[in-house]
UniProtKB/Swiss-Prot annotation:
It comes from Mycoplasma capricolum subsp. capricolum (strain California kid / ATCC 27343 / NCTC 10154). The modification Phosphotyrosine is found at residue 223. This is L-lactate dehydrogenase. One of its GO terms (biological process) is lactate metabolic process. Keywords: Cytoplasm, NAD, Oxidoreductase, Phosphoprotein. GO terms for molecular function: L-lactate dehydrogenase activity. InterPro entries: L-lactate/malate_DH, L-lactate_DH, L-lactate_DH_AS, Lactate/malate_DH_C, Lactate/malate_DH_N, Lactate_DH/Glyco_Ohase_4_C, NAD(P)-bd_dom_sf. Catalyzes the conversion of lactate to pyruvate.
């Protein structure tokens, strides 16, 4: 893909989608943006509102407009955030029926447009919804990316940094599996500037109870935010920007995205959060870590949970 004059189409011009767009515009990752939404007026309004940044933001763009699925045909990346938001107290998996139907319709229209680029999806429950999209479109699985556990991992890094009083960007810590309640913190691979996180347990700077609490707080963070302000969107918007930028710039960055497993980590036939190399061809390779027995068991259980949910929407594809 070209590094300039890239075109990004956003499907779903709500809070998550527009948070992504605002972050993307500020970082200058593309030159052309198109918004598609089931309700044309908000899409048009957001396009006009964001157009006002043209004369203000240094990393600017050439055009932004409300459009239709026909605009997907020559897009480099399609980002999908459409779907109803999570309600207070509701798990992501409980959203599956309605959002899977929405995604089937979107997938049909995107395929019909002749789109041949990379799709990045954040609609919840993202692992299942990404699976539905790939099955309905029949697109190369490598060219369909879920946001996976990028946000979960960012939350984990922030909480570890907060506990140890270090900058989150100095923390390398990862969450794998479902973007949801069954997610797994992979402590065996976590480190701070190269020093394993478990060394901090050995020296007394952290306890195993601290790690358990940090993982629990990571899982509960979305519920906390939703209870306070009814939705999460800035964090996931930033994560989507990071993924799309890695695609458009062919960065070969390793991110915790939703990629399709075909035997990796002893699981297959589903999308879930794993470390994968992201470049212009989508997720290009899954990185396989040596998980501990406990981590593998938890990961298997997370995949089993997702498979059960996928089974409930198989009639759609």
């Amino acid at each position: 893909m070209k590094k300039t004059a890239n075109k990004v189409v956003l499907i779903g011009a709500g809070a998550v989608g527009t948070s992504f767009l605002y972050a993307a515009i500020n970082q200058g990752i593309a030159e052309h943006y198109v918004l598609i939404d089931a309700f044309p007026q908000p899409a048009e309004g957001n396009a006009l509102d964001l157009s006002d940044t043209l004369a203000v933001i240094p990393h600017s763009f050439t055009s932004i407009k409300a459009g239709s699925y026909e605009d997907c045909k020559d897009a480099d990346v399609v980002v999908i955030t459409a779907g109803r938001p999570q309600k207070p107290g509701e798990t992501r998996l409980e959203m599956v029926a309605g959002n899977a139907e929405i995604m089937k319709n979107i997938a049909t229209e995107v395929k019909k447009s002749g789109f041949d680029g990379i799709t990045v999806i954040a609609s919840n429950p993202v692992d299942v919804i990404t699976h539905v999209y790939q099955k309905v479109t029949g697109f190369d699985p490598h060219k369909v990316i879920g946001s996976g556990t990028t946000l979960d991992s960012a939350r984990l890094r922030r909480l570890v940094g907060q506990k140890l009083n270090v900058k989150p960007e100095s923390v390398q810590a990862y969450v794998a599996g479902e973007h949801g309640d069954s997610s797994v913190a992979i402590w065996s691979q976590a480190n701070i500037m190269g020093r394993p996180i478990l060394d901090y347990v050995k020296c007394g700077c952290l306890t195993l109870e601290d790690l358990d609490q940090i993982q629990k707080d990571t899982v509960d963070m979305a519920y906390k935010i939703i209870n306070l302000k009814r939705a999460t969107f800035y964090g996931i918007g930033a994560c989507l920007t990071k993924i799309v930028n890695a695609v458009l710039r062919d960065e070969k960055a390793t991110l915790m995205v939703g990629a399709q497993l075909n035997g990796e980590y002893k699981n297959k036939d589903l999308y879930t959060g794993v470390p994968a190399i992201i470049g212009s061809n989508g997720w290009e390779k899954i990185i396989e870590w040596d998980l501990t027995k406990e981590e593998q068991e938890k990961f298997d259980k997370s995949c089993e949970t997702l498979h059960k949910t996928i089974d409930s929407v198989k009639h759609l594809f």
